Amino acid sequence: MSTYHHGDLRAALLRAAGKILEEKGIAGLSLREAARQAEVSHNAPYRHFADRESLLAALAAEGFAILSQDLEAAGREMGAAYVGFALQHPQRFRLMFGGLLPIAKYEDLRVSAGRAYQALVELMKSHKEIADPEAAAAAAWSLVHGLSHLLLDGHFAQEQREEFVKQVLGAVRFAAAAQRSA
């Protein structure tokens, strides 16, 4: 194992930790294992992360930043982008939304989580006829978030997934349209 890092140690540790997270889950991630995979000394992570929780918080913040970009790029197809993110990054998704981390303790995490949700609120605000964009965003998020968890937890066979996703996203659109006409 090398004690020298080339480039950005923090980024190298986050890459290694992200790989471990997706392979072994939250329980399988340690600072020591991230250091080993990043090929640095076992003490090197402490230059950037006070403890395992702060490493997990950084991974979650990074996940919310990626999710925000995906949602903003998706426009009206945010629901599909959200489900897609969950299915592509199941362990990171569980970390982000699992209640393990005290969001208020980590500024980067709080800001990046807020940005992801705000993208949905802004989409609802773009529909002037929606009387309460915050409530509409909360309702849409609840449906899509629940769908994501059901899919991750294996409650639907692989061959049923696509049709079920279409049905739920259609229900979200229908509910938004109903609120506009009410």
Where are these regions (language model features)?
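Amphipathic C-terminal alpha-helical segment
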Residues: 142-159, 174-181
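Hydrophobic alpha-helical connector segments
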Residues: 69-92, 140
